[in-house]
């Protein structure tokens, strides 16, 4: 959906290492992908500055398989990077709800004001693994673009499961 929303002609970037299927999905949809090396607190600054990508796919909390969590400074660096026209961040936040801290990490989506962060999450870890439901949060601008370009898709999650989740 991300490639269909933003376009395959862009260069995408993802963390290295990252969940192997991220690269497979982008490439399967015809997107060029750069892998950016992780440091102790997120993508290395030199690699981020040098990338030709216009879309950055990040897992800022406990990135898999490295278990690296992006620092607050690194999250701000990602937002600064995305402040250039035509740049986007895809924030894949699959496990931030599970934290030993009293307060979960702030998402890049919640910190960015530009409307160019796409937030992805799932209910598989917080509610039940058998509920294979994810969700995407878009800014108003991106939601309008979604409706125009790929709004014809229908939901693949059975209605019964959606209703059960809504009651929780």
Q: What do the predicted segments below correspond to?
A:
Residues 93-95:
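Conserved Walker B
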């Amino acid at each position: 959906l991300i490639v269909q929303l933003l376009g395959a002609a862009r260069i995408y970037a993802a963390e290295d290492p990252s969940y192997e299927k991220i690269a497979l999905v982008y490439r399967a949809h015809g997107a060029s992908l750069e892998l950016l090396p992780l440091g102790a607190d997120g993508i290395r600054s030199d690699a981020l500055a040098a990338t030709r990508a216009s879309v950055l796919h990040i897992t800022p909390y406990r990135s898999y398989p490295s278990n690296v969590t992006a620092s607050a400074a690194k999250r701000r660096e990602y937002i600064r990077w995305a402040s250039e026209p035509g740049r986007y961040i895809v924030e894949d936040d699959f496990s931030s709800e599970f934290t030993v801290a009293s307060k979960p990490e702030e998402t890049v989506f919640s910190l960015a004001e530009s409307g160019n962060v796409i937030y992805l999450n799932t209910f598989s870890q917080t509610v039940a693994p058998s509920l294979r439901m994810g969700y995407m949060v878009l800014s108003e601008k991106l939601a309008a673009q979604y409706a125009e370009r790929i709004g014809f898709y229908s939901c693949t999650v059975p209605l019964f499961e959606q209703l059960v989740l809504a009651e929780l």
